[in-house]
Amino acid sequence: MDALSETLRVVRLVGAIFINARFTAPWCYQSPRADTVAPVLEPGAERVVIFHLITEGECYVEMANEPPVRLVAGDAIVFPQGDAHRMTSQPGLPPATGGRLDRVLARRPRQLDYGGGGPATRLVCGYLACDARLAGMLLTGLPSLVRVNVRGSNAGAWLEASVRYALAEARSPRPGGAGVLSKLAEVLFIEVLRLYMNEQSEGRTGWLAGVGDRVVGAALKAMHKDPAHAWTLDELARTASSSRSVLAERFQQLVGSSPMQYLTQWRMLLAANLLSRSNAPLASIAEDVGYQTDTAFSRAFRREYGAPPAAWRRSQSMRVQA
């Protein structure tokens, strides 16, 4: 399993909501910062990632201190940092009264249909809540706006057909419909990340850039495949068919940490995932993430999370119950 797939297996993407929007020019729709609507999407959510898919027509997206970006049918845009933005038929329009995301989410069904009667644009809006630390690692280095066109990918036709199915589910909810919408939103989001990786240009940094790099990607794959292994820089360099110095420099440049620091971070993320999702004893979790003693594991976990594993597990349990 590659590093992206392994990370997505651990990252919890929950609370997916689809909004089916039809606008007719002129129109302008304001989306506030994601953290302001997080309580509506998923109570207690640590991080919210927002994305839109243009299914018909064209429009612009506007963000503070950034030039407007023109979007066409098939374009998918993701806001990794949850920035406020405007979707509009042309730059410079004020948002319409009632055209705010936090107000729309209070309606059932979650649909938008308004504008001035001109050319129509259709959008699908997806919102996913996820673990802050895992999402932080996955999305680090990404720009405030990621844009790809899904129609150019092999999965494009399937994705658009799936979105149409999701919209039908939203109009006529059936048992299990919420789960279907959540999975479809997750798949669409993952496909956007994959397309972005394939389109990466020179000079990009971040975890996804590291996954796509020949040297760093090989080291990441090895650590994610067997996190309990007693990896050394020498062994990782051999795995990546590289020298120690090249691997260390390239890893720091793209991921922002040394390979050994990253290994510890990944192990602690896995441990936190096991602590919050299972009743496994601490000794078993420690062994699963590469620690021979509870003491060494507890010390490393406290450095990362500010509390011993047992206390952190109890706090997570109390948070869920609340």
Would you name each region that the model predicts?
Residues N65-Q81:
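Short acidic-glycine-tyrosine-enriched beta hairpin
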Residues V124-R147, R151-K221, R238:
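An amphipathic alpha-helical interaction segment
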Residues A76-V78, A84-Q90, S298, R319-V320:
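N-terminal basic, amphipathic alpha-helical segments
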Residues V187, E191-M197, A218-L269, A286-A311:
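Basic/polar phosphate-binding segments, predominantly the helix-turn-helix DNA-binding elements
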Residues M1-Q30, A120-R122, G136-N154, A322:
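A short, N-terminal "cap"/entry segment at the start of jelly-roll beta-barrel domains
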Residues Q90-T121, R133-R147:
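Double-stranded beta-helix
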Residues I54, M223-D226, L275:
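Short helix-to-turn junction characteristic of helix-turn-helix DNA-binding domains
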Residues M1-V69, R86-L112:
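Generic protein-terminus/edge-of-domain signal
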